[in-house]
Amino acid sequence: SELISALSHALDMTEGQPPGHCVRCCWIGMQLADQLGLDSDARWELYYTLLLKDLGCSSNAARICELYGTDDLSFKRDFKWVNGSLGQVVRFLLQHTGRDEGLAKSFQRLLRIVREGDHLANELIQTRCERGATIARDLGFSGAVAAGIHSLDEHWCGSGRPQGLA
């Protein structure tokens, strides 16, 4: 348990989250599990899914740097504040793409992102989710824990990624 907690804190750092983020998510999830009356097996799976939800987060770091010409930590941290509106997305991209590059290179990056943005976002999320699920299985966690980690970015309404589950 202490080892998993330490790993969870390390995942918070690699995802650009404040220390204890996954632990807080886990606490909230366990409160919901109590209210829902989940059995002990389901609670165990939920507990580890939430503590380790970001297992795959470092798998897309190099790709973020390659695509956006920026460091992945500030990119991931700051993207959490984007609400999805076009204005916020454009502002975010202008602030984070090619930060230390010349205008021409930054413009090239932005143009590619505008053209291929949805595909690139799917690629990044799919890589993260698949890698996280694989790591969970490699660590000996159940298929349910791996599936929960794989579904990290799914939304209740079907608008999430990588599969658009509802």
Where are these regions (language model features)?
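Histidine- and acidic-residue-rich, metal-dependent catalytic cores
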Residues: 1-166
